[in-house]
């Protein structure tokens, strides 16, 4: 399913209420006494020097304005890491270079991120008009340049690193990000009414994560993410994260925790996550946890609730033996795991993709997402792969109403979620027909 009309996006956004803060309030605009308008060359030159100049001169207590309907060429990376109490009014449209070789040269020289924004109380405000406020990255050409059985060409930039606190991000819009849309780090951040459109008309858009999140008190709501990787990926150390009233799809990899434990020496620490009232369309995954064999740490108190899925291959998926088709790992302790505790999956409804399961990210045989799964039927409502009989504790499922498109009974794959540690699991942990207890 492809996003082809901005009117459709506008309709979806207009159907949800405005979101409020995530626990902190950004500073009053009255304290931002300086208004700085970014001038545009109107397409005749590179506007990066002007943008960098304005960010440098107006780094504190300012409103930085990209004018509505105006185009800006951002042909060089922008780095503004000393911001404080700044509102970025993104009412224009930013255009990245369409010269793939030029961008790869910049990335290979050591600059991996196109926009780097850091500082407390850095707000981003786009316009309600869905035709403006876009960052246009022209990723389609990059995706189409990927060779057969490749997983994305080298030299792809991350679009944005956004590190802040006590901030709001409203009406952020990203069109065809090349890869890795936004790395969002910090505390007390509210994101609302964002659009990330990484749907492809050709080759698969590898690594087009929408939001990679790390921090405390972060809320993402009322947004649309169509992409070829995680809509949200929560990393360590993260606490009190909310993802609600969103629509995600295309060939999304869903609402994910991790991956965790790739570095066996790092202790993963994640608590209090809630994913609620989310629609998932044509995705590979809906709710997903992924950690590597040999990892260590604890993820505790996680809920996915009121999740509607349409044509999703794996609606509920847990693996403590995550596999990356581009990475080889040897010498890890196979009995070590990132521990999972107090996980709830509640009120799931909709259809399991039985007819055309999987997605375009398959570059190996077997596909990375099928590796290690016995006798897949693509009727599975749940896949629960615990690494040991002690690594999953207090798992709960309630009101799981998922049906395969072939209209057979839903099935389950479950490994080592023991009844002793999971008395309210809601079904028998075995491989076969899914039957609620």
From Swiss-Prot:
Q: Check the UniProt entry and state the signal peptide residues, or none.
A: 1-21
Pfam families, A to Z: Glyco_hydro_28 (PF00295)
Q: Which Gene Ontology cellular-component terms appear in the entry?
A: extracellular region
Q: Which residues are glycosylated?
A: 25, 42, 82, 99, 149, 269, 301, 311, 428, 431
In this chain the PbH1 repeats are located at 215-236, 238-259, 270-291, 299-320
Q: Which residues does the Swiss-Prot or TrEMBL record annotate as the active site? A: 229, 253
Top-level taxon in the UniProt lineage: Eukaryota
Q: Which UniProt keywords apply?
A: Cell wall biogenesis/degradation, Disulfide bond, Glycoprotein, Glycosidase, Hydrolase, Repeat, Secreted, Signal
The reaction(s) this protein catalyses? [(1->4)-alpha-D-galacturonosyl](n) + H2O = alpha-D-galacturonate + [(1->4)-alpha-D-galacturonosyl](n-1)
Q: Name one GO molecular function term.
A: galacturan 1,4-alpha-galacturonidase activity
Q: What is its main location?
A: secreted
Q: Entry's InterPro entries?
A: Glyco_hydro_28 (IPR000743), Pectin_lyas_fold (IPR012334), Pectin_lyase_fold/virulence (IPR011050)
Known function? Specific in hydrolyzing the terminal glycosidic bond of polygalacturonic acid and oligogalacturonates.
Q: Which PANTHER family match?
A: EXOPOLYGALACTURONASE C-RELATED, PTHR31736
What is the similarity comment for this entry? Belongs to the glycosyl hydrolase 28 family.
- Name-wise, this protein is Probable exopolygalacturonase C
């Amino acid at each position: 399913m492809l996003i082809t009309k901005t009117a459709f996006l506008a309709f979806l956004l207009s159907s949800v209420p405005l979101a409020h803060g995530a626990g902190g309030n950004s500073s009053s605009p009255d304290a931002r006494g300086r208004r700085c308008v970014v001038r545009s060359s109107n397409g005749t030159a590179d506007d990066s020097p002007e943008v960098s100049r304005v960010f440098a001169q107006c780094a504190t207590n300012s409103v930085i304005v990209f004018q509505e309907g105006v185009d800006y060429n951002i042909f060089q990376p922008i780095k503004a890491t000393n911001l404080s109490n700044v509102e970025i009014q993104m009412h224009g449209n930013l255009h990245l270079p369409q010269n793939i070789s030029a961008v790869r040269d910049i990335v290979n020289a050591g600059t991996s991120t196109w926009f780097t924004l850091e500082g407390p109380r850095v707000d981003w405000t786009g316009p309600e008009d869905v035709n403006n406020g876009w960052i246009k990255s022209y990723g389609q050409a990059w995706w189409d340049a990927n060779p057969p059985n490749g997983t994305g060409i080298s030299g792809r930039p991350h679009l944005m690193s956004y590190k802040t606190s006590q901030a709001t991000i409203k009406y952020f819009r990203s069109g065809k990000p090349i890869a890795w849309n936004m790395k969002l780090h910090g505390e007390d951040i509210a994101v609302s009414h964002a659009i990330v459109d990484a749907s492809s008309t050709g080759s698969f858009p590898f690594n087009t994560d929408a939001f990679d999140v790390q921090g405390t008190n972060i809320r993402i709501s009322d947004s649309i993410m169509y992409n070829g990787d995680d809509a949200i990926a929560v990393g360590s150390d993260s606490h009190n994260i909310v993802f609600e009233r969103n629509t995600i799809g295309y060939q999304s990899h869903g609402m994910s925790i991790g991956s965790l434990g790739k570095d066996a020496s790092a202790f993963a620490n994640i608590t209090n996550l809630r994913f609620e009232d989310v629609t998932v369309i044509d995705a590979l995954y809906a709710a997903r946890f992924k950690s590597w064999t040999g990892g260590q740490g604890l993820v505790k108190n996680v809920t996915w609730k009121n999740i509607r899925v349409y044509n999703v291959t794996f609606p509920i998926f847990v693996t403590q033996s995550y596999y990356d088709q581009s990475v080889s790992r040897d010498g890890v302790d196979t009995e070590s795991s990132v521990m999972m505790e107090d996980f709830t999956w509640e009120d799931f409804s909709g259809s399991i993709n039985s007819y055309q399961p999987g997605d375009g990210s398959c570059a190996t045989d077997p596909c990375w997402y099928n590796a290690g799964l016995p006798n897949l039927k693509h009727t599975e409502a749940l896949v629960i792969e615990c690494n040991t009989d002690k690594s999953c504790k207090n798992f709960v499922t309630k009101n799981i109403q998922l049906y395969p498109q072939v209209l057979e009974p839903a099935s389950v794959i479950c490994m080592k979620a023991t009844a002793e540690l999971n008395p309210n699991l809601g079904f028998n942990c075995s491989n076969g027909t899914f039957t609620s207890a």
